[in-house]
Amino acid sequence: DQIDRVVSMLRDIHPGAVFLLTTPPECHRRVRRKGKKKYYYTYVTNTKVEKVAETIRRYAVGKGLACWDLFSISGGRGSAKSWVKYQLSARDRIHFNIKGYELQGNLLYDAIIKGYNDYVGK
């Protein structure tokens, strides 16, 4: 398992490190299609991302690691279209643009602060 190899390697180098795994957001992939006279490109949902997100979530639970589920937080299945619609995706439809990364950072910050406040409030 690639995730386990990376986490194990990092633990060997930094035994006291604390890990926060994150899942990827849904994204598109570019596909080539044949038109009447020539080929053209279009974008379709990359269905493998949901499987990757589920694998990361399961791994984190199994190993007792924290996991921030960006896949679900960003809207889950079908959400990539919204990120494009609201101009939060880069032109490649895989990565966010500056506004998208700022939103991602704010969402992560809010989650960390909420977790901390829940922890100290116990």
Report the location of each language-model feature.
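Alpha/beta-hydrolase-fold catalytic nucleophile elbow
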Residues: 22-23
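Catalytic His-Asp segment of secreted/periplasmic serine-dependent ester chemistry enzymes
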Residues: 27-122
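Oxyanion-hole/transition-state-stabilizing segment in secreted/luminal serine hydrolases
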Residues: 1, 26-27
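Loop/turn elements at helix/coil->beta-strand transitions in domains of secreted/extracellular proteins
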Residues: 14-19, 62-66
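Secondary-structure transition/capping motifs at alpha-helix termini
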Residues: 10-13, 17, 115-118
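Bulky hydrophobic/aromatic packing residues
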Residues: 1-3, 14
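Generic structural signal for well-ordered alpha-helices
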Residues: 3-8, 53, 57
